UniProtKB/Swiss-Prot annotation:
PANTHER family: PROTEIN-GLUTAMATE METHYLESTERASE/PROTEIN-GLUTAMINE GLUTAMINASE (PTHR42872), PROTEIN-GLUTAMATE METHYLESTERASE_PROTEIN-GLUTAMINE GLUTAMINASE (PTHR42872:SF6). The active site is at S156, H183, D276. This is Protein-glutamate methylesterase FrzG. Residues 147-334 form the CheB-type methylesterase domain. Probable methylesterase. Required for the normal aggregation of M.xanthus cells during fruiting body formation. It is also a component of a sensory transduction pathway that controls the frequency at which cells reverse their gliding direction. It may remove the methyl group from the gamma-glutamyl methyl ester residues in FrzCD.
Length: 334
């Protein structure tokens, strides 16, 4: 069965005709030219399995957001090189599941890559966008350092929104640092850190080499480097080869967290394709730490969490809405 693709943006179908559609896995639907003002109407009329959006126009982001509120559908966004990583990341905030950089003169290899990505995203459930704000933080009594001085989080497709929901439940006075590995396009982690800083009460930074972690701070693995944690609480960036196709690798972060902090570590694996992170989560559990996997119903893609569950790596399998509270409970009990 071929998946139905709606293209939104001036001249996008003409560009894509160079190699996107083979008639077997993907077929175009809708008018040859769909502008952003007409995006929602086109989605409602033609029922695409996935939408391909060009980000070069100023009204692209509101159009994505409007579609995701009114009639959710998986969205892949293409951005030209003139956009910064932070600007392109805003497409993911609006609801796009992924963003790819479009070269000035894309050739067949690029469209083959886009085609494969569209086939994957067409099989992903879209989640309706709900605008939320961080809840007011209640005053908390000072407590001694917990025996869980580290929370390590791994996520892939759908991860930024999921992580934001978890972190909104955590106050600024959270007595542990949080190390976070997210599969995301190169150059977008700065935008992710900036967005999460505005969405949560926590301090959110791109991780830097040899930095001593601080409680109440989230450290994001930068694109192109593995993030590791050391027993004394320092971060290490490793530019070595990708592990099973990923750099940063969720497995490498979680494994180092388990090795370094053992029973003082809480590991969390959220929505994402594939199996990266499952082995690392099991390492945390085997060394006495506590572990959580997101449940299927609340995941955009139940791939990484499913693999962790099948391995016996998760103490608890929880809906996204309960993970933040679980982290607070486990830290507070200590």
């Amino acid at each position: 069965m071929a998946f139905r693709v709606l293209m939104v943006g001036k001249g996008l179908r003409a560009l894509a005709a160079r190699g996107l559609f083979d008639g077997e896995s993907l077929v175009p639907v809708g008018p040859a030219e769909v502008d952003f003002a007409g995006a929602l109407v086109a989605v409602q009329r033609h029922f695409p399995d996935v939408v391909l959006v060009d980000l070069s126009a100023l009204d692209a982001l509101p159009a994505i957001e409007h579609v995701m509120v009114e009639r959710p559908v998986p969205v892949l966004a293409l951005h030209p090189g003139v956009l910064s990583g932070q600007e392109a990341f805003q497409a993911m905030v609006a609801g796009a599941l992924d963003v790819l950089e479009r070269p000035a003169n894309p050739g067949p290899e690029f469209w083959t890559h886009v085609s494969r990505k569209l086939v994957l995203l067409a099989q992903v459930k879209a989640v309706r966008q709900v605008q939320t704000r961080p809840p007011p933080q209640a005053a908390r009594e000072a407590k001694p350092p917990p025996p869980y001085p580290l929370v390590a989080i791994a996520a892939s497709l759908g991860g930024p929104k999921a992580v934001a929901q978890v972190l909104r439940m955590i106050p600024r006075a959270f007595p542990a640092p949080i190390a976070y590995c997210q599969h995301i396009s190169d150059g977008f982690t700065e935008g992710l850190a900036h967005w999460l800083s505005n969405e949560t009460a926590l301090r959110v930074l791109e991780a830097e080499h040899d930095v001593l972690m601080a409680p109440g701070t989230v450290y994001i693995a930068p694109s192109g480097s593995h993030l590791l944690v050391r027993p004394e609480g320092r971060l290490e960036l490793d530019a070595g080869p990708a592990l099973r196709g990923f750099r940063p690798s969720c497995d490498m972060l979680l494994t180092s967290a388990g090795e370094s902090f053992g029973p003082r570590c809480i590991g969390v694996i959220l929505t994402g394709m594939g199996r990266d992170g499952a082995r690392g989560l099991k390492e945390i559990r085997e060394r006495g730490g506590r572990t959580i996997a997101q449940d299927e119903a609340s995941s955009v893609v139940w791939g990484m969490p499913r693999e962790a569950v099948l391995m016996g790596a998760a103490h608890e399998v929880l809906p996204l809405s309960r993970i933040g509270a679980a982290l607070m409970q486990w830290v507070d009990v200590c």
